[in-house]
Amino acid sequence: MGVCTEERPVMHWQQSARFLGPGAREKSPTPPVAHQGSNQCGSAAGANNNHPLFRACSSSSCPDICDHSTKPFGNAYGTESFRSYETADRATFEDSAAKFSISRSRTDCTEVSDETTSGISFKTEPFGPPSSPESTSDSKITRNLDDCSGCGRQIQDRFYLSAVEKRWHASCLQCYACRQPLERESSCYSRDGNIYCKNDYYSFFGTRRCSRCLASISSNELVMRARNLVFHVNCFCCTVCHTPLTKGDQYGIIDALIYCRTHYSIAREGDTASSSMSATYPYSAQFGSPHNDSSSPHSDPSRSIVPTGIFVPASHVINGLPQPARQKGRPRKRKPKDIEAFTANIDLNTEYVDFGRGSHLSSSSRTKRMRTSFKHHQLRTMKSYFAINHNPDAKDLKQLSQKTGLPKRVLQVWFQNARAKWRRMMMKQDGSGLLEKGEGALDLDSISVHSPTSFILGGPNSTPPLNLD
């Protein structure tokens, strides 16, 4: 076997001193020789005479550095060539060459070992962390998260539901009791691994409290319900006289308190001014609550302070105590007091309930008519159009509604009242003749000239608010 017969590129250091070690000699195609080992060099050259890089030197005295060592390799090694050993320190080179020739025999110089090329084994590391039973189980858990908790199938839909830290198909999330789909519900409840809707959960597991004694109510206990309030059967009685109320009895609710019909009528009789007062001033203060004070800024002057448990109707209040305020405006036809107390207009905090009859008595008393006040630009627009047309149609009312921002019903009533006033003035003019001089321009309530449009120029500030039926 020849020396370095494999034609492969070899790494060469730029500094020539790196070639001085034995390791560099093993990889070099032309190991340097010293004067003491000239026979070895000749034998090595003779053993590979056919190779162009190892031809014998023709000179009688072979120098330490042969000329062929500076020649470049063939195309297999590229265009890079070895640097000449002449650039190295000569003394250092001779010393290392002598040691190399002594330590290596002829066979070692001519024999090529495969250890230089195949002695190093490369270890290829796999990509990613090593697999383990724990990582394998984690990947299985990740895959299981994509499965529906209801049917167990993989969720491939674009949208899904997430409830109780699980994923569901939109059609699989149902109540366990009533099988009602919960995809449109805002909340659901879980108990023992089952999903319930709100109604079934409270009916099975919910613990409500009595609105009077505040004690818990079990699911198998009979209760009395009034609106959103729940009472024990024994607690469902009048707050004042403690009369038990059974199915079919009439009662009233004021601030979550139950009253019988008699005491409810007394409570309602003291407040007839407005229904909104019941939300600000609870009726419990009328019965002499210990928190009620005559000097309090929130006390109602129309209410008399009476001891707790004593109820005095408003008609029996002695002289000197403040009387209930009278309602302003024209008098209305009033119903009997015993009926009015249960058919009056009651606000959100008070309600008459007919327990067990299936329907509640609605308010039948007529409320006050709403009064509308117009702004100056609205009056100018309506008066200008009234000068042109006294009876606008639906199309004209729609245009006026867009200009003024008023509803069509309001505009219709205004034109109706304006036409009535204009007719009355025309009849008055026909009966009394011309108006006196110096009276000035009038509004819709009066006319100063014969023309039906002359009152349009009157001051808008004098126009009173109009009544809407």
UniProtKB/Swiss-Prot annotation:
From the Swiss-Prot or TrEMBL record, what is one GO molecular function term? RNA polymerase II transcription regulatory region sequence-specific DNA binding
Q: What are the entry keywords?
A: Developmental protein, DNA-binding, Homeobox, LIM domain, Metal-binding, Nucleus, Repeat, Zinc
What PROSITE patterns does the record point to? Answer: HOMEOBOX_1 (PS00027), HOMEOBOX_2 (PS50071), LIM_DOMAIN_1 (PS00478), LIM_DOMAIN_2 (PS50023)
- The regions listed as transmembrane in this protein's record are none
Which protein, by its recorded name, is this? Answer: Protein apterous
Organism annotation: Drosophila melanogaster (Fruit fly)
DNA-binding region residues: the ranges are 367-426
Quote the InterPro entries the UniProt record gives: HD, Homeobox_CS, Homeodomain-like_sf, LIM_Homeobox_TF, Znf_LIM
State a GO cellular component annotated for this protein: nucleus
Q: Name one GO biological process term.
A: leg disc proximal/distal pattern formation
- Stretches assigned to the LIM zinc-binding domain: 148-200, 210-263
Q: Where is this region: Disordered?
A: 21-44, 111-141
| Functional note | Required for the normal development of the wing and halter imaginal disks.
* Top-rank taxon, per record: Eukaryota
* Keyword RNA-binding attributed: no
User: Which CDD domains is this protein grouped with?
Assistant: homeodomain, LIM1_Lhx2_Lhx9, LIM2_Lhx2_Lhx9
* Location(s) in or outside the cell: Nucleus
Q: Which PANTHER family match?
A: LIM/HOMEOBOX PROTEIN LHX, PROTEIN APTEROUS
> In which tissues does this protein get expressed?
Expressed in PNS and CNS.
